[in-house]
Design a protein with these regions (language model features):
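Short, positively charged loop/turn segments that connect secondary-structure elements
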Residues: 224-240
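Short, cationic-aromatic polyanion-contact patches
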Residues: 258-266
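Cysteine-rich micro-motifs
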Residues: 59-72
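Short metal-binding segments enriched for Cys and/or His
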Residues: 71-103
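Short, flexible, mixed-charge glycine/proline-rich loop motifs
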Residues: 32-42, 54-60
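Positively charged, polyanion-binding regions of nucleic-acid-associated proteins
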Residues: 194-213
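A short, conserved structural fragment
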Residues: 244, 248-258
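Long, low-complexity, charged/polar intrinsically disordered regions in eukaryotic proteins
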Residues: 123-200
Length: 266
């Protein structure tokens, strides 16, 4: 973990405060103000543990900035469970940002009818690839913004390792654990889009095995699945071995025995 982390701030309240949104009439704007205020007061950067700074309103694809790390964050909030797809802004702008060096990380927040935060997780920017951004149909000609193309974030495509919880089922997780989990997969940020795509796909296959130790033969069972995801690659088994080696070099896996791997965090 980065030595720059000197002191951890912990979440001390899960209550959203309606009074901070008293000047708003729109229900969505009220909720936006309440959740953004709560996040700014309670939540820290997962990379360094510092407080986040709020951007000016309506900035495309960014709501918060870490002054220390210079990382951008966007907040998506919802009453009730977070769905498998989350609406976002303009498709072209989203693709432009996630394929750039300043791609944002995303906070996904769920609150209940009493305005209490039930779940909050962050998905680091290095987990975002164009494959998990779905293009929506253009707005119809009679719409005010006719032809505008929005997008959805396919949260169902985000592996468990890319869902770093601060709050889960109303229980606050220690900030130290949040930062540790973030740094456990930070090696992805140094890879290009194609490399990240392969690594994330293989990591997702490992997660689907649902056990801390697994064999190379078990990973070969995903050969046809990975071939569908990467139709231009005709050497899937060697690619699986290569990705497992990358994950081992990054400290994500270790060798348990010949042909057998073990997750370093499970």
């Amino acid at each position: 973990m980065k030595s720059s982390i000197l002191h951890f701030h912990h979440i001390t309240s899960l209550a959203l405060r309606p009074e901070v949104a008293a000047g708003y009439k729109s229900a969505s704007k009220k909720v936006g103000k309440m959740t953004e205020t709560w996040l700014g007061e309670q939540v820290v950067c997962p990379a360094c543990g510092r407080r986040l700074r709020h951007y000016e309103p309506n900035r495309p694809v960014a709501d918060f900035l870490c002054p220390e790390c210079r990382l951008d964050f966007e907040l998506k909030s919802k009453k009730g469970p977070i769905s498998t797809t989350v609406n976002d802004g303009a498709y072209s702008k989203m693709i432009e940002r996630i394929t750039s060096d300043t791609a944002p990380s995303f906070f996904f927040l769920q609150y209940d009818a009493e305005y209490m935060v039930r779940n909050l997780f962050v998905t680091p920017a290095h987990y975002f690839t164009p494959e998990i951004i779905e293009e929506r149909a253009p707005l119809k000609p009679m719409a005010q913004r006719a032809g505008w193309v929005g997008c959805n974030i396919l949260t169902k495509a985000i592996p468990a390792s890319g869902r770093i919880y601060y709050v889960r089922d109303g229980q606050v997780r220690p900030t130290e654990e949040v930062c540790e989990q973030y740094h456990h997969t930070a090696f992805l940020s140094g890879r290009n889009l194609e490399q990240r795509g392969w690594l994330i796909d293989v990591m997702t296959c490992v997660e689907r095995l649902r056990k801390p130790e697994f064999t190379l033969q078990e990973m070969y069972a995903f050969e046809s699945h990975l071939a569908q995801l990467h139709p231009d690659n005709h050497n899937i088994r060697p690619k699986i071995r290569q990705q497992l080696q990358f994950l081992r070099d990054a400290g994500y896996l270790t060798f348990a025995s010949r042909g057998c791997y073990k997750l370093t965090h499970s």
